[in-house]
Amino acid sequence: INKIPKIEAHLKGIRHKAFSVLIFNNDGKMLIQKSAKEKYHSGGLWSNACCGHQITQDLLYEAQKRLFEELGIVCKLRDLFRFHYNEVVSSSMIENETDDVLIGFVNSYDIYPNPEEIEKVKWMDFSALLDYIKINPNNYTIWFKIITNTVEKSYRKLINDMLTPIKD
């Protein structure tokens, strides 16, 4: 997979590495964020807690660093799954990414969104989130719709099992 500037990768549709972080709280709710409208693509859309592009071989370090930069969250992350997608996201942007999805759990509601990256955040019940996505799919990023669909089909029980120690 190529190592080039992310803007070039998106303009030319060149395949590259990315990561997406899912965060759940001790009530089992997922943190979602609405990206700042000024973002160069997918601005103003709802998505998972944070995303980024993998530059080094240390995926967990990069994801934890990005999570702190965007939301002020520090937590342990675990690999959940990986997928590839190739989608046009605007008239000039193409997402051709191998996306590693990571998951983390927090006991706190203390979130400190970076206003340059994030317009707002909210905690959502996963079932309600799926309903909102079905009703208004254009309000959500392409990759987040793929992720939530995959989680619903294959990983929901695993996530609930992971939440059990946090709820105790």
State what each model feature region is:
Residues 1-20, 26:
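Acidic, metal-coordinating catalytic segment for phosphate/diphosphate chemistry
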Residues 31-32, 49-80:
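The catalytic Nudix box helix
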Residues 2-6, 35, 84:
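Short clusters of small/polar residues that mark proteolytic maturation junctions
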Residues 7, 43-44, 81-84, 89, ...:
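Nudix hydrolase/Nudix homology domain
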Residues 18-53:
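A glycine-rich, hydrophobic loop/mini-helix early in the fold
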Residues 14-24, 52-57, 131-145:
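Short, surface-exposed secondary-structure junctions/capping segments
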Residues 21, 50, 79, 100-102:
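A structural signal for short, well-ordered beta-strand segments
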